[in-house]
């Protein structure tokens, strides 16, 4: 599946294995580049849906991953892979109720 956004100047590409659309990967291509400088690959990020965004982010933090954009809204967070790729984590279904410690966490770096 492909979705063009003229106003936002980006394209979303949704990839899934044949006959298994439940394991979908979203690729974001920014038409004007991503302004990340040298070594940039001109795409925005990878996005994954998870069953519980708070549990997922806690597990990532417990394993040394920096949560660059905490899930303050119970719906969306961002981290970076070891090689600098931005990864969006999305709550499957409705957003969870906002809760601590996420609600008070500041953004770290860029995502």
List where the protein language model places each region.
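Core segments of cupin and vicinal oxygen chelate
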Residues: 1-22
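N-terminal beta-strand motif that seeds the catalytic metal site of vicinal oxygen chelate
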Residues: 2-3, 43-48, 90-111
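Positions that flank functional sites
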Residues: 6-7, 75, 99
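Intrinsic-disorder/low-complexity coil detector
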Residues: 17, 69-70, 97-100
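Vicinal oxygen chelate
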Residues: 19-22, 29-86, 91
């Amino acid at each position: 599946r492909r979705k063009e956004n003229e106003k936002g100047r980006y394209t979303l590409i949704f990839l899934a294995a044949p006959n298994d659309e439940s394991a979908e990967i979203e690729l974001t291509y920014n038409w004007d580049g991503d302004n990340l400088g040298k070594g940039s690959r001109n795409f925005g990020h990878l996005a994954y849906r998870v069953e519980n965004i708070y549990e997922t982010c806690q597990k990532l933090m417990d394993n040394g991953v920096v949560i660059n954009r905490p899930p303050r809204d119970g719906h969306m967070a961002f981290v970076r892979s070891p090689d600098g790729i931005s990864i969006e984590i999305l709550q499957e279904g409705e957003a969870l109720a906002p809760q601590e410690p996420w609600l008070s966490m500041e953004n770290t770096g860029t995502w």
